[in-house]
UniProtKB/Swiss-Prot annotation:
Protein name: tRNA modification GTPase MnmE
GO cellular component: cytosol
InterPro entries cross-referenced by the UniProt entry: G_TrmE, GTP-bd, GTP-bd_TrmE_N, GTPase_MnmE, MnmE_dom2, MnmE_helical, P-loop_NTPase, Small_GTP-bd
Biological process annotations from GO: tRNA methylation; tRNA wobble uridine modification
Keyword Hydrolase appears in the UniProt entry: yes
């Protein structure tokens, strides 16, 4: 158990007015704070309604006090929670009262969760899940984050780590005891176990990718010439009149944003100004901002007015626009206004990039676009039993997979046990980064400072 010499305090509830405000204290002097503020020693894990006292003995507030004796607390230390009225002035008065006591300081962002991690009350993936649960923007995200907090992700990672460790032991035994008559590397066990680990890791990666999509979402930019129907498409996808729609070209001058969910997948939709030669300074700024958003998009919906051209290849429709796009940019061509052209709505899988015919005005073909966007992100829509994952988790899983593949190649091609053992060690190291078993102090600092103060 990690020992901290100082005691920290912070408001655990959001700042602002509220019916209830909670102040959390953690550290070796939490019991002294309880004695000073409550005026008496508190029973462990027992809610007591009493006045909260100032240093002169007068009452500042009244409410519920809870004391948790370490290590049986969230942080693993002595913890005091004071639940009073949630006025911002009152909360500030209470915290200033506590800070006057010797050895108490304000908590850093995420420091309560950091202490819980350092005291082995939860691992790093679970600690991150606390922040993800608080920030969840949908029911699916909240459920996935809670499953991660309960250890669903960590359990899968730990199972992989254990499997890698056992295989390392077997391989290194073969290297260290070459005089044994059994050829450990060629008896099939190592190869079978390695393939099993690789398959299990790939399954975890697929689940983690779904969890990352639920957390991060997809940034989709609608771009094209003026009056192609971009704002109408934004309204159709969001289900409300987010953007003004007129027959006047250039109505949209600035970037418009909407956040929606498709079967639990967050979608950040951005409508941009029509791209053309600017006729004035305001339009020029709008077009510049449009290109800034396009450069940062996960996918661009290239909006085309179907009544102006029969072409379906974007290079034929607008070569200058396509040439300016990043090579790796995901692109979908949207032929709008099928209600006027008479074309059948839906997706055409023959084209590259994909082509979707729809009517942003009537909504025909919008469901095909929604399904297409899910497919583009590899989102299955099945979140039952899944967990939340972050970008760093995906990177660690990818690194581990790469090392296992290298080890497999060395084993199958050269029977190189020493190299396989090293690749297994590196794979184990990357997997352990997810739960914090092997993590740099710098990474821990970046993770916990992104938390709320009081968490």
């Amino acid at each position: 158990m990690n020992e901290y010499t100082d005691t920290i305090v912070a408001q655990a509830t959001p700042p602002g007015r509220g019916g209830v405000g909670i102040i959390r204290v953690s550290g070796p002097k939490a019991k002294e704070v309880a004695l000073a503020v409550a005026g008496r020693e508190l029973k462990t894990r027992y809610a007591e309604y009493l006045p909260f006292k100032n240093e002169d003995g007068s009452a500042l507030d009244q409410g519920i006090a809870l004391f948790f004796k370490g290590p049986n607390s969230f942080t693993g230390e002595d913890v005091l929670e004071l639940q009073g009225h949630g006025g911002p002035v009152l909360m500030d008065m209470m915290i200033r009262r506590i800070l006057k006591l010797e050895g108490i300081r304000p908590a850093r962002p995420g420091e309560f969760s950091e202490r819980a991690f350092m005291n082995d009350k939860l691992d790093l993936a679970q600690a991150e899940a606390i922040a993800d649960l608080i920030d969840a923007s949908s029911e699916e995200a909240a459920k996935s984050a809670f499953r991660s907090l309960q250890g669903a992700f960590s359990t899968k990672v730990n199972e992989l780590v254990e499997a890698v460790i056992h295989l390392r032991i077997y391989v290194e035994a073969a290297i260290d005891f070459p005089e044994e008559e059994i050829d450990f590397l060629s008896d099939g066990k190592v190869s079978n176990d390695l393939h099993g680990i690789i398959d299990n890791l790939e399954a975890v990666r697929r689940e983690a990718n779904q969890g990352s999509i639920i957390r991060e979402g997809m940034k989709v930019v609608i771009a094209g010439r003026p009056n192609a129907g971009k704002s109408s498409l934004l309204n159709a996808l969001s289900g409300k009149d987010s953007a003004i729609v007129t027959d006047i070209a250039g109505t949209t001058r600035d970037v418009l944003r909407e956040h929606i969910h498709i079967d639990g997948m967050p979608l950040h939709i951005i409508d941009t100004a029509g791209l053309r030669e600017a006729s004035n300074e305001v339009e020029r700024i709008g077009i510049e901002r449009a290109w800034e958003e396009i450069q940062q998009a996960d996918r661009v919906l290239f909006m085309v007015d179907g009544t102006t051209t029969n072409d379906t290849d974007p290079k034929d429709i607008w070569p200058d626009f396509i040439e300016r796009l990043p090579e790796s940019m995901g692109l979908t061509v949207i032929r709008n206004k099928v209600e006027l052209t008479g074309e059948a709505a839906g997706i055409c899988h023959v084209n590259n990039p994909p082509l979707i015919r729809l009517s942003a005005r009537t909504g025909e073909g919008i469901d095909s676009l929604r399904e297409h966007l899910k497919d583009c992100m590899g989102f299955s829509g099945t979140t039952e039993g899944g967990f939340m994952a972050r970008r760093r988790h995906l990177e660690a899983l990818e690194q581990a997979a790469q090392h296992l593949e290298i080890g497999k190649e060395q084993l199958e091609g050269f029977m190189a046990g020493e190299i396989l053992a090293e690749e297994l060690r590196l794979a184990q190291q990357h997997l352990s980064e997810i739960t914090g078993e092997f993590t740099s102090d710098d990474l821990l600092g970046r993770i916990f400072t992104s938390f709320c103060i009081g968490k």
